[in-house]
UniProtKB/Swiss-Prot annotation:
Keywords: Cytoplasm, Endonuclease, Hydrolase, Manganese, Metal-binding, Nuclease. This is Ribonuclease HII. Residues 14-204 form the RNase H type-2 domain. It catalyses: Endonucleolytic cleavage to 5'-phosphomonoester. HAMAP family: RNase_HII_B (MF_00052_B). The gene is rnhB. InterPro entries: RNase_HII (IPR022898), RNase_HII/HIII (IPR001352), RNase_HII/HIII_dom (IPR024567), RNaseH-like_sf (IPR012337), RNaseH_sf (IPR036397).
Length: 204
């Protein structure tokens, strides 16, 4: 992926920030957002030319890319929102909260935001544009999706040591058949989202 999408924005702004989230759909664990700024007129080379939507990449490639993105980015930030907060405010608002926290932690402060998706609610006076399927179109959004995905996967792998009965290291909290069977057998843990109801278990 190249930086063709960012190029016209760099003519107006120095600090363009790509933002994406991962973990909206799982039954357990946090929603995670990442924000990434590259130098103005940055040209990806080497392994960074492989950057794509994180879902389209092999795990090993994502890990390598995440490390290299962190080295070459001007600034990056990651934010987590817990299952408790997700249950309190709903997953959409929790996603906005994660994205805003990631943006607020950046230095320098971005001048323009490119947000994956079709809507966003900002807490900062920074102009933005939402891009549907931005993680497959926009270099900086794809980079954010990769570091968010790797961060969350590692988080869930660590959780698997505390809650081995749920198989988090295999499905990362997503509603697979094995995960639903584990919930049926053991109930929900402290890291499960109580507001995500399973009709197959008779929950309403």
């Amino acid at each position: 992926m190249d930086v063709a999408f960012e190029s016209p924005y760099w003519k107006k702004f120095q600090y363009i920030c790509g933002v994406d989230e991962v973990g909206r759909g799982p039954l357990a664990g946090p929603v995670v957002a990442a924000a990434v700024i590259f130098d103005r007129y940055f040209e990806p080379s080497g392994i960074l030319e492989q950057i794509d939507d994180s879902k389209a990449l092999r795990h090993e490639t994502r890990v390598l890319l995440s490390s290299e993105i962190k080295k070459q980015a001007l600034s990056f930030s990651i934010a987590e929102i817990s299952p408790e907060v997700i249950d309190e405010v709903n997953i959409l608002q929790a996603t906005f909260l994660a994205m805003n926290q990631a943006i607020e932690q950046l230095s320098p402060i971005p001048e323009f935001l490119l947000i994956d998706g079709n809507r966003f609610k900002t807490t900062l006076p920074i102009p933005f544009e939402t891009v549907v399927k931005g993680d497959s179109k926009v270099f900086s959004i794809a980079a954010a999706s990769i570091i968010a995905k790797v961060h969350r996967d590692n988080f869930m792998i660590n959780l698997a040591e505390r809650y081995p009965e749920y198989g988090f290291a295999q499905h990362f909290g997503y509603p697979t058949k094995a995960h639903i069977e584990a919930i049926k057998m053991f109930g929900r843990s402290k890291v499960h989202r109580k507001s995500f109801k399973l009709s197959c278990l008779g929950e309403k």
